[in-house]
Amino acid sequence: MVGRRALIVLAHSERTSFNYAMKEAAVAALKKKGWEVVESDLYAMNFNPIISRKDITGKLKDPENFQYPAESVLAYKEGHLSPDIVAEQKKLEAADLVIFQFPLQWFGVPAILKGWFERVFVGEFAYTYAAMYDKGPFRSKKAVLSITTGGSGSMYSLQGIHGDMNVILWPIQSGILHFCGFQVLEPQLTYSIGHTPADARIQILEGWKKRLENIWDETPLYFAPSSLFDLNFQAGFLMKKEVQDEEKNKKFGLSVGHHLGKSIPTDNQIKARK
């Protein structure tokens, strides 16, 4: 789509990797459709993933009792965050779509990407308790995870030894991305890439490029709207009583995280509602 901007965040150290090939395919496909594409190749940038006092360039509010969340929020408001954090925040602000390309490591994101989230998604910039989830600062933006795994798809199935991929994705897609407001699109899952032959890899890359041609028009994944909850500390941010009563006799819960003690909706974190 002409006029749109995309940010691709890559978390893989090797240019010969399939993750790098997926990133390159995304750049080519989006540019072909008129997108402006910016990259954050975290390993190539030697991005520092460790939060510390060095993230604040100005005077600390309480150096004797340093608390990173409070100090980083103040530094953001006063313009005293370190330049590398500010640079990434500017990329995010300009982006309509953010693609995260990485290998699944220990059932989560690589450490360097986790550090990127921790340092860049500063309070007041990426979230507040008054504006989170579908009311979050990034609510007009879309995000998609493009993940490779070592294990096969069956290993991440309901009966698989690793357990349901939907459960693995929830902390990332809901706890990080949607928490900050992102409309999260269906993840691009590439299973068992180390055991995938060359011809099949080419097909995967072509399928990814094909999907990206119309990715802006895709339906986001479903997350329980914040309007279903009492959004204040006195009420405990709990689901409203009338909503609980309404959902009581339904077969499935609302989502992976809001299962309400019932069966999880099938592929809640993998497929958008039709």
Curated annotation (Swiss-Prot):
One of its GO terms (molecular function) is NADH:ubiquinone reductase (non-electrogenic) activity. There is a cross-link at residues 250-251 (Glycyl lysine isopeptide (Lys-Gly) (interchain with G-Cter in SUMO2)). It catalyses: a quinone + NADH + H(+) = a quinol + NAD(+); a quinone + NADPH + H(+) = a quinol + NADP(+); ubiquinone-10 + NADH + H(+) = ubiquinol-10 + NAD(+); menadione + NADH + H(+) = menadiol + NAD(+). It is found in: Cytoplasm, Cytosol. It comes from the Eukaryota. The modification Phosphoserine is found at residue 82. One of its GO terms (cellular component) is nucleus. Its cofactor is FAD. Substrate binds at residues 126-128. Coiled coil: none annotated. GO terms for biological process: cell redox homeostasis; cellular response to oxidative stress; innate immune response; negative regulation of ferroptosis; negative regulation of protein catabolic process; protein catabolic process; protein polyubiquitination; removal of superoxide radicals. Homodimer. Interacts with PDLIM4 isoform 2; this interaction stabilizes PDLIM4 isoform 2 in response to oxidative stress and protects it from ubiquitin-independent degradation by the core 20S proteasome. Interacts with TP73 (via SAM domain); this interaction is NADH-dependent, stabilizes TP73 in response to oxidative stress and protects it from ubiquitin-independent degradation by the 20S proteasome. Interacts with TP53; this interaction is NADH-dependent, stabilizes TP53 in response to oxidative stress and protects it from ubiquitin-independent degradation by the 20S proteasome. Flavin-containing quinone reductase that catalyzes two-electron reduction of quinones to hydroquinones using either NADH or NADPH as electron donors. In a ping-pong kinetic mechanism, the electrons are sequentially transferred from NAD(P)H to flavin cofactor and then from reduced flavin to the quinone, bypassing the formation of semiquinone and reactive oxygen species. Regulates cellular redox state primarily through quinone detoxification. Reduces components of plasma membrane redox system such as coenzyme Q and vitamin quinones, producing antioxidant hydroquinone forms. This is NAD(P)H dehydrogenase [quinone] 1. The gene is NQO1.
